[in-house]
Amino acid sequence: MPENLQLVIITGMSGAGKTVAVQSFEDMGYFCIDNLPPSLIPKFWELIKESGKVTKIALVIDLRSRTFFREIQDMLVELENTNFIDTTILFLDATDEELVSRYKETRRAHPMAMDGLVTEGIRKERAMLEEIKADAQLVIDTTDLSPRQLRERLNKELATRETHEFRVEMVSFGFKYGLPIDADIVMDVRFLPNPHYIDELRPLTGMDQPVYDYVMGFPETDEFYTKFIDLLRTVLPGYKKEGKSSVTIAIGCTGGQHRSVALTERVGAELKEEDYHVNITHRDRLKRKETVNRS
């Protein structure tokens, strides 16, 4: 039996990118099987044991059936006592609006839209997958990711898991554009003074020094920052202890241009100083400029 087997179970919303994920895992040297019923996994495992050659496995499994969900849970308990010592459930998600857009673009029927309404199919599927999403070690929101960006994200995630490195994903966002659906921790900083109402600061972002200094120049900002960092010093070790390879922290303001960007930069810098591996993404930082340019 090969040692250090890595098993990735790929699931998630229809249209969220599972096909791209499978292609990415194949490129990374994984043995991939698409839509294997959970009831056949024990037999598949026996074949893997007999071969002794496969060390990386990725399975795409349809978990819309509650029976399938129970089977996969039982299977994972069994695998905890085997050499599949690194089992990861990867859940791919996207906003309902983005999923509808993708289905319209491809003109495909949603597998759960019995009456032809894509929105109803998405609603049913999301409800059925709620449990497995909660149990997933890795949730990726593909709403704003191109296929190439999804491949890059998966490469990064898998590299982290293989080296057992704990990573913190910092994301700034604007509430007007929706919550990041893969966030583990969401913080609302709309209570802080808004640079948007200062004429010379309005066109800038939280990465520009004048905006950064403005946001950080208030006592309430210092108080919030100190308490939030203290909170993270408590919860991040807990996430790591529970076996998570990464945690996504989302900080939001109204438009995702000023306050959230500045705070995300500051919190990210502090966590780097404390030896966390940190990636920073400003999801909506330039969206206002893009809107102005299109109008």
Curated annotation (Swiss-Prot):
Positions that bind ATP: G12, M13, S14, G15, A16, G17, K18, T19
UniProt keyword annotation of Cytoplasm present: no
Keywords: ATP-binding, GTP-binding, Nucleotide-binding
Record-level Gene Ontology MF annotations: ATP binding; GTP binding
Residues noted as binding GTP in the record, renumbered to the chain: D62, L63, R64, S65
Keyword Nucleotide-binding in annotation: yes
InterPro entries membership: P-loop_NTPase, RapZ-like, RapZ-like_N, RapZ_C
Pfam families documented for this protein: PapZ_C, RapZ-like_N
SUPFAM superfamilies tied to this protein: P-loop containing nucleoside triphosphate hydrolases
Signal peptide, first to last residue: none
Known function: Displays ATPase and GTPase activities.
NCBIfam families on file: PRK05416.1 (NF003828)
Record family assignment: Belongs to the RapZ-like family.
UniProt protein name: Nucleotide-binding protein EF_0766
